[in-house]
Amino acid sequence: MHIDSLTPQAPPSGHPPVNGLVLMGGGARTAYQAGALQAIGALLRQKSHSRHFPFQVLTGTSAGALNATFLASKAMGGLNGLDDLANFWSAIRTEAIYHLPSTPLAKFSRWATALGLVLSARQQAAAMDSLALVNTLHKAIALDKIDAALRSGVLHALAVTASSYSSGIHWTFCQTRDGLPIPWSRPGRRAEQQPITIEHLMASSAIPFIFPSTPLWVDGGMEYFGDGSMRQISPLSSAVHLGADRILAIGVGQPQRANLAGQRNGNGRPSLGTIAGHAMASVFHDTLEADVAQIARINLSLNVLPDSVRAELPFRAVEVLSLQPSASLDALAQDHVHTLPRPIVRVLEGLGALQGSGAALASYLLFEPGFIEALMSLGQADVKARSEEILAFFEPHSVDPVR
């Protein structure tokens, strides 16, 4: 990450801090974010009498973009919006997100199921049909409420990222309070002012090989987009560009992959499910902590400069709090994978993705109550374990150009 993309112009001294929320992607795993945010809402209620929505800048990638946009639509309701997100996830089922392409004999035969997958892959370059998710999002997200939250000043900006298969560029689509053009462009990364739609969310959450790409109109032409986690080298950058002084970033990565490492195949060769899960991890989870560390280094560099030098620099320090699962989500998925619809279980079984390290693949697709509730409970427990740190993050102190 470059310093110019990370710490743009410093705000006026003493201005109230702008809180940003960055939500990373990860399919069903992002239910963890809903649990964590609900627990944060409970902490803030206990700490003060304020019920205001705690974030002014919302950015999200993949399923994290769905969460961010849902929250934007509920921001006028204050802290209740965090509870609404948790309730949304509690009601989710796999059939409301995707289904396997079907043939008349699919429910009787694994071969018929495989044939449906092959036909879908040829027609849509994707294994699953995600039309159900379109319907779910239209019912759950009132897009007009986002505009109302922006006009009222409750929100300053909402941003959703997606990766263009057509051009290879990683795009950030921004809907802001002032509606002005978004000024940043970097090699391989662009930003554009657009009202966020369900199509943007489908594009951002189109997991490669799993869900079909989505066409979006951008830069004067139509391009096909897939999951925003692909080629996302700087997940915190858009929140900083949009004015966040303090950023809470919630990922859904794997803390200790070694938890499942001992359950190897007898011949030592990884299954297709293991390889696919490893590939998914490289797409979704390898950039956030590196970005947080880079911000910490830049903050340190700015803070050791003499006051006279800092006063001349058009940069600012940005406070970041990162929250990641404290337990293995892969192992958690292994306990619940058999609750998926039977046709999907058959496919995962054929890929070797029902046990051991292969269960990582299932964790992205497991939109079933047991797994969702376990993820949300983990998010709530992790917030409670760090409650003092989180409450300190939300203290209403003023922000100086360099902290």
Could you tell me what each predicted segment is?
Residues M1-V18, V402:
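N-terminal low-complexity/intrinsically disordered extensions
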Residues G14-V22, A28-L131, N135-L137, C174-R186, ...:
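Patatin-like phospholipase
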Residues A28-T30, A68, Q232, P255-A258, ...:
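Flexible loop/turn segments at secondary-structure boundaries
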Residues A42-H52, K145-L150, V304-L313:
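Alpha-helix termini
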Residues Q124, S301-R403:
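C-terminal helical/tail subdomains of lipid-metabolizing enzymes
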Residues Q124-A162, I169-F173:
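Active-site periphery "cap/insert" segments of enzyme catalytic domains
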Residues G153-D245, A249-I250, P255-T274, H278-A279, ...:
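Active-site gating loop/helix substructures
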Residues A261-S301, P343-I344:
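Acidic, Ser/Thr-rich peripheral helices and adjacent loops at domain boundaries
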